[in-house]
Amino acid sequence: MSADPSSSTSRTVAVIGAGPVGCLAAMAFAKRGWRVEIYEGRADLRLPESRANLALRSINLAISHRGIVALQAVNSAAADRFLADAIPMHGRMVHTTAGKEETIYYDRDHQHINSIDRAVLNQGLLDELFFRHKVQNIDFDGKKMTARDLETGRDVEAHFDLCIGADGSYSVVRRQMMRVMRMDFQQTYMKDEYMELRMPSGVGASGESTFLLHPNRLHIWPRHSFMLIALPNKDKTFTCTLFAPSTEFDKLDTVDKFLSWFEHHFPDAHRHIGADALAKDYSRNPRCPLICTTSNPYHYKDRAIILGDAAHAMVPFYGQGLNCGLEDVRVLSALLQAEGITSDKTSEDPTIVDPRLAHALAYYSEHRHEDLVAICDLAQNNYVEMRHDVTSPMFLFKKAVDNVLYMLSRRQRLSLASFGSALASVPFPAGEPSEWIPLYTMVTFRPDVSYATAQRKARRQARVLTVLGWLTASAVGAGSLLALVASYDRARRLLTR
């Protein structure tokens, strides 16, 4: 991936972690002329056995506008390839215990998120890596590190100008940074866990493979304290994920108990998956923890920075973990460009700090932190919406009102294509849209609106909805949509006094 591996005048970036975030970071720096080396402790993720192991505990990835724009900013051709392998999902399909299905669209314009297999995304980004090399120690001040070749057991030393930690929730790079700097860090395990299940494809009238559920929906079986979700795959199967409190899983300590419980709560999913397949998945697939981590700052001098889950692991209920991590890369790359940071070495002496690069990394830490805290909070809150609120008439009513106000106040529809070029060189979009925009639309389909801005705006809009509900109930009992819309300006004036 290096522009010129033999050149001694180009800076070297060592990327630790070969997941989507690490690989996109490597591509971004290679594009800017840096020498790139990627270190990954796992075996080659493109091998069949690696993909099989990944499938046992890997939630399918939902990539939306933020992630796509980040990919486009680095390599538009790669973004097009990934989208060709993705399946669009235009909304949630809610499954009741009575077998009824109802679609709740994400957006009044039927904009969609995309389901993509994690292995497919990784495979498309991987190129030149040191697989089976586990980082043992990092000397940031000396700009060198030791990695163990797990095949031979030998330690190898590598030198770098910048180290990027994209090595996940249990980041080695983050732990090494905490030895030499003051970093605030918090790790929280959720009371819930998850287990992967798989729904097979069906057989059509002519013997062809078919989807057993609507292929362009994210399927949800909300059951208040737990839920099942299913995302479509290109081979006509569905990757299902069961989320439940640890105490609920503890009760299901035999296959028979699990099958009986599953059939009672998810009868249609039980029918589609089948008892034998469910029993196999229950026995083979692990119960996995849900973890949330926060840290600050994200950098050390001019020589280290953490991105993605290494900096901010979040629960998967907003579908923004991948998108946020990829956006980290876009923001950092655009910031380095804006600061005029090039691939040219500034000194051969590792003790000398490059003030411009140090300032750029510090600026990233300071200005990215608010957004990362916001999306972690939003993701956690969205779990309640997915497993409980989507069954509530009040939720559906508020969503309808949200969309009406969005329609009435919107000035123009912004397409995905319009964001790519606009954000490629803008690390932190400024300002706040003046029109009414639902929270989900801002987070998922408006990469020009920061997470923190979306959260602040949504809180104000929620207060407006509360006042509208009160005014409508007072005026017309159950209320009519026209009366509610007519109350909009009055409610907004009340809130801004």
Where are these regions (language model features)?
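Conserved Rossmann-like nucleotide-cofactor binding loop
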Residues: 21, 44, 170
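Conserved N-terminal helical subregion
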Residues: 2-13, 58, 64-196, 255
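Conserved mid-domain beta->alpha element of the FAD-binding
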Residues: 15-27, 31, 197, 286-381, ...
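Glycine-rich FAD pyrophosphate-binding loop
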Residues: 30-55
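C-terminal helical "tail/cap" subdomain of flavin- and related membrane-associated enzymes
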Residues: 334-497
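Generic enzyme active-site microenvironment
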Residues: 38-39, 165-166, 307
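Conserved FAD-binding catalytic core of PHBH/FMO-like flavoproteins
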Residues: 137, 142-290, 294-300
